[in-house]
Amino acid sequence: MRITCYQCDTPTDVEVPFPVKQFVCSNCFSIYKATETGDFTFKDKYKYDKQIGGLALGLKGTLEEEEYTVTGVVVKEYMNYYWKEYVLASTTGKFLYLSEVSGHWILLREIPDDFAKGHPKIIDYNDKVFKLYDIARPRIAAAAGFFDIDLPTGLITMAELIAPPYMISFEKLEKEERTVFLGEHISKNQIKRIFKPTKELPNRIGIGLVQPYFFNVRQLALILCSVTLLILLTHLYVYHDKQEEVVFSNDISFSEYNDKEYISPAFTLNGGASPLTISVHSGVDNSWANAQVALVNEDTNEEIYANKDVEYYHGYSEGESWTEGDQSDDFSICGIGAGKYHLAITVVKAPEDLNNTGMKVTATWNKASYWNIWMLVIIMAVIVLIAYFGELYNEIKRWEDSPYTPYE
């Protein structure tokens, strides 16, 4: 349908799949009423000094597997707060509505009014609990496009209940039955993909009425708990028969193995990967000794090196005795898997230490450690707590403009 405004000569051309009762010029906001003969007569004019912007009239997009056309837009105002509502019509006579508030979009459809009368503060609908967010009486400040009704000139009573990302909206005129809409958050990027607007859409400001959190915290917690349980069960299955095993223990003489390696007998490790703990002991006395250990995989010739100093000092000064260090120490080589291995050990001591004769080296293949699992559990718990308090903060901010906020 093409209509040229009598007041400003601006043409409006949109494919309209319904009988038009009212037309509003998008340039000067002149209101025209359809006559019985199909003509349009000037009725009034909205006093609105801004451009509506947003989605242009005539844009088409596919929603719910059906093509819809933007046939009209209404600007509503309440206490100097403005928002836009777009009318979308399909060729089969279906209507959908898009509400844009501060860059946040909600897709609405009319549903049967089988709710309790009045404005209940809580509604159970489709297994969701909707809570009353606001009751307002806005007016239509401006409009543009084609409409199948006469747009109301008085105040509209609205009640909005939310269960993000959904909402239920009640609208009622003074002498008419109320209309009920079910809304769902739709992202700005989705709007762009569906309608491909040529003009930039408004940027988001604040938290939208039904804007969802970045992710579902409850689902995140369930997923992380499931992952933790799976890891724990796998760990128990792999290591259920794992026992601590001493695979090597021997005293190594400093004089016999001076400047040469001690090669241990080969040993075989079976089962899942576990840490190999190397314990060293030497009779150091105000002196030091050192052990360098190479774990050699005889199947792959892969070598893992580590070394450990053993130091023990003691004395008496300023009327008090003191000690530092120990004659024993240990260290671990983590994640050693099954296979055949041997140790190549080099031991040295302080040249001035004439009393210390050797060092005892013991290698123990330990039981699997739960340390990594507990660290993972702690990290996951921290993630869930951060997500929970982030979502809580998000909800507090969402409800801060509502007189019915549950966070006071």
Q: Where do the language-model regions lie?
A:
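Short, surface-exposed polybasic-aromatic patches that bind anionic ligands, especially phosphate groups
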Residues: I3, P11, E15-V16, S26, ...
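N-terminal membrane-entry
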Residues: R218-C225, K367-L385
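Short, aromatic-rich amphipathic segments at membrane interfaces
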Residues: I205-F214, K349-L376
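Membrane-proximal low-complexity regions enriched in glycine and acidic/polar residues
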Residues: Y97-G145, E244-S332
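Hydrophobic membrane-insertion alpha-helices, especially the h-region
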Residues: L220-Y237
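Extracytoplasmic/lumenal ectodomains and periplasmic regions of secretory and membrane proteins
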Residues: P138-Q190, Q292-D353
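Short metal-coordination and nucleic-acid-contact micro-motifs, chiefly zinc-binding Cys/His arrays
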Residues: M1, K21
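Juxtamembrane interface at the cytosolic side of transmembrane helices
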Residues: Y213, V382-E408
